[in-house]
Amino acid sequence: MAVKVAVLGGGNGGHAAAADLSNRGFCVHMYEDARFAGNIKKVFDTHEITMAGAAGNATVKIDMVTSDLQEAIQDVEFIFVAVPAFAHDVYARALAELVHPGQTVMVMPGTFDSLIFWKEFRKKGLEDVVVAETNTLPYATRLQGPGSTLIMSLFNPLKVGVMPACRTQETVEKLRAFYPSLEAVESVIACGLSSLNPIIHVPGCILNAGRIEYAKGEFYFYTEGFTPCVARTTEAIDKERIALLDSFGYASDIVAHGVGGSIITDDIGEAIASDPNFAKIKGPADTNSRYYAEDIPYGLAPWAKLARAMNVDVPVIGSMITIGSALLGYDCWTRGHSLQDLGIEGMTKEELKEYLETGK
């Protein structure tokens, strides 16, 4: 009998995960909020997704497509959350009412937000529920339309942190049935600080803002926009990220080693240029893109807030958030999740590491 899993979200990540997992023989319950279900009416009507690219070419049947969250997670052991970061609070509160002992929730990606799920679950007194997060979506993917997804590549390794960290080994062993390239890191904080999107999206978006607004999507983000000065800014952000990881005593590696290029190099510009998948990526079309609206307030800003609490200086990251706020017309420092939202405000480094390890 096929293993049942739930995939929450009907966007890029949700389409790719539902199609890939179904194609590999898992029984997939795909959920989309009723407010947005009309965007993927074709999938609701046909229960089919056409996939192409690195994970195979097929039109696959999705066992369940629903806007009933309780129905979606009924009798499943693993729940994969692939929704924008600004929706994580809503999903955390909703799942806290419905999850049951023995279930594992994996946020793809998390960028610390697994802590929001854990906080909400603890409020409900939930026992024997595990929350994991990945450092990126498992796939470099683009929707080609409702019910159609292009998977350009699969991330290998795909880093994962588990809350509580004391359950990492058993949890990752189970999750590798779905994502064999998973590589465990020390905690969900270590995983969140390994997130790729804030590093490789934000500097290019800010330094190419005029070109992005003018081109309206007819712009190859990496081929045209990832010039040497953008690469240097990216590496400056990366150094500050590594300094924060180092302050916790966590293992670290430069972003150039994690983007999946065909050569091994310490130069992020060379790494990006060596991967033909980056050359295909156009956009963003405007400053409403998730590259801005998600990766600055929900990506870089939580890093900077944690750095401030841990007395780690991150001036380049801070400048990106401040300039991003001016570009976007709203305060990216306050729009994203706070340490209070994550349930870790006021903790010393030692207290935080204990909480990450034990969940208490």
For each predicted feature, which ranges?
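Rossmann-like NAD(P)(H) cofactor-binding subdomain of soluble oxidoreductases
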Residues: 85-147
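Substrate/ligand-engaging "lid" and interaction regions
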Residues: 138-237
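Long, low-complexity C-terminal extensions of enzymes
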Residues: 258, 263, 271-352
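Rossmann-like NAD(P)-binding element
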Residues: 57-99, 103-106
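Nucleotide donor/acceptor-binding cores
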Residues: 2-3, 129, 156-158
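NAD(P)+-binding Rossmann beta1-loop-alpha1 motif at the extreme N-terminus of oxidoreductases
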Residues: 1-53
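Small-residue-rich helix-loop
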Residues: 230, 236-276, 280
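A non-catalytic, amphipathic alpha-helix used as a structural packing/dimerization or gating element
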Residues: 90, 170, 174, 229-247, ...
